[in-house]
């Protein structure tokens, strides 16, 4: 069957509704504030060939990388009804705290597709609470590494024996299993209503439709046979050294294909800012998705139009055993910024840079861990000021409510406010960042993984840059990426970057 326009809309929303229900089951069942309140989790459906059919509107850095996880599971000869667990960044994962559950959906006695749930767990072992140590030089220092394995109670016992908060992890994993089961139930319900052959063909039609729409847009943006669009941007150190690390990209858009070539990017770092290729692909996919009309379904058809080149062993195509905790959350942001910069230099209308960081904050002590990311300023665009205090780019989480944070952890929030005046000046101003100040109520260890502390987000069209962020403890400035002990009474202050302004300010 070939769906008409109405059929594409109906079936596209039917699949997407199942993915959204998976997400709701997860966040309403999870124990940890990071998943329950911040919603640092994602859900999607894949067909039996490993292409994404539909996703919920969750976390870009998760969603674009899930295809690699499904591909890794398919190599394990999944049987109908099997449930797989993984977090290995070099076998389909992103970074170790992101535990992924993949259910092989049984339809008529065969594997009809996959329900996929990825969620950030606030501890998976390793050398520091939160499993994101700033000074890690190997993957193994960041936590337990799980290749694609069938989930069994014994596998769960092994995992829980290697984490600091086993009760919380057990509850969050149960929520993920429930979400994966809801996905399978939803697909079987659609198959019962429409018939399995028709449903399978509808999924193919949706993939082909998204590919056609994507390639049509890219054909209008073609760079032809001319010089590729090029840009370079930098990371502010790797947690071991403060030296800048370069990310270089050349973009060619031709024959309906978007080719991002990262040749010339820095070699893999000693610290934890390295990216597995799946995360790099996710960042490029995010950029391409912003170029498409809203009604184009975000599925594997869009990914068909992408091509990524990255030398093995470089910063954005790291190899085992490079540490990757910050690569997923910080380097992914810079990859997206760099690709956007190349497009802007080529004359494409893109906004000024947003904060370009997730401002990762991890606290932990005996029997507890806490993780959050903090919003900042978005860049302005031609005709609109940038929003303030929002998550930008590869993140899409909420800020943790103060009441929840203080109720469940030995922390007191002294300040939570807009960082007035931090947005870049222009005809349209960049959004303001955030000030978030924590008072320590018990001895603990903290890790900060942040960016844009030296180089503020750039403006566009003559607008000025947003203010760089700052990390302080008791008023003393810290680096962008640090792990340190904290005593009772210490005050940790995070000032997040403002977004860049757009256009010259009219006097």
Show where each model-derived region lies:
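Glycine/proline-enriched, intrinsically flexible loops and inter-domain linkers
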Residues: 1-80, 86-107, 111-259, 263-507
């Amino acid at each position: 069957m070939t769906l008409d326009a109405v059929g594409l809309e109906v079936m596209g929303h039917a699949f997407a509704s199942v993915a959204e229900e998976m997400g709701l089951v997860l966040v309403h069942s999870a124990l940890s504030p990071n998943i329950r309140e911040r919603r640092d989790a994602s859900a999607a459906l894949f067909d039996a060939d490993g292409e994404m059919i539909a996703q919920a509107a969750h976390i870009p850095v998760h969603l674009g990388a899930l295809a690699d996880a499904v591909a890794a599971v398919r190599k394990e000869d999944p049987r109908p009804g099997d449930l797989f667990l993984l977090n290995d960044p070099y076998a389909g994962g992103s970074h170790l705290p992101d535990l992924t559950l993949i259910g092989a959906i049984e339809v008529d006695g065969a594997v009809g597709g996959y329900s996929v749930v990825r969620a950030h767990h606030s501890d998976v072992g390793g050398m520091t609470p939160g499993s994101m140590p700033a000074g890690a030089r190997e993957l193994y220092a960041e936590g337990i590494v799980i290749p694609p394995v069938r989930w069994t109670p014994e596998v769960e016992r092994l995992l829980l024996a290697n984490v600091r908060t086993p009760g919380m992890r057990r509850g969050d994993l149960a929520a993920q299993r429930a979400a994966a089961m809801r996905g399978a139930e939803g697909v079987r319900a659609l198959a019962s209503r429409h018939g399995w052959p028709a449903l399978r063909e509808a999924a193919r039609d949706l993939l082909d439709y998204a590919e056609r729409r994507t390639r049509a847009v890219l054909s209008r943006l073609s760079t032809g046979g001319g010089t590729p669009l090029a840009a370079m941007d930098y990371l502010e150190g790797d947690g071991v050294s403060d030296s800048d690390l370069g990310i270089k990209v050349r973009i060619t858009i031709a024959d309906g294909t978007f080719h991002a070539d990262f040749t010339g990017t820095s070699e893999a770092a000693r610290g934890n800012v390295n990216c597995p290729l799946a995360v790099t692909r996710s960042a490029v996919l995010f950029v391409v998705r912003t170029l498409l009309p809203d009604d184009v379904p975000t599925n594997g058809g869009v990914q068909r139009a992408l091509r990524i080149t990255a030398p093995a062993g470089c910063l954005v195509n790291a190899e085992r055993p490079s540490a990757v905790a910050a690569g997923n959350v910080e380097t992914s942001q810079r990859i997206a910024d760099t690709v956007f910069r190349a497009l802007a230099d080529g004359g494409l209308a893109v906004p000024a840079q947003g904060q370009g960081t997730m401002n990762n904050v991890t606290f932990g002590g005996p029997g507890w861990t806490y993780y959050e990311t903090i919003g900042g300023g978005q860049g302005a665009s031609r005709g609109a000021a940038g929003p303030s205090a929002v998550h930008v780019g590869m993140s899409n989480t909420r800020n943790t409510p103060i009441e929840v944070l203080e109720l469940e952890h030995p922390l007191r929030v002294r300040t939570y406010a807009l960082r007035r005046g931090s947005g870049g000046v222009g005809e349209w101003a960049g959004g303001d960042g955030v000030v978030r100040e924590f008072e320590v109520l018990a001895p603990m260890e903290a890790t900060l993984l942040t960016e844009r502390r030296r180089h503020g987000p750039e403006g566009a069209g003559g607008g000025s840059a947003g203010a760089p962020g700052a990390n302080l403890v008791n008023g003393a400035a810290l680096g962008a990426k640090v792990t340190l002990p904290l005593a009772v009474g210490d005050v940790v202050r995070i000032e997040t970057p403002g977004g860049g302004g757009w256009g010259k300010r009219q006097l």
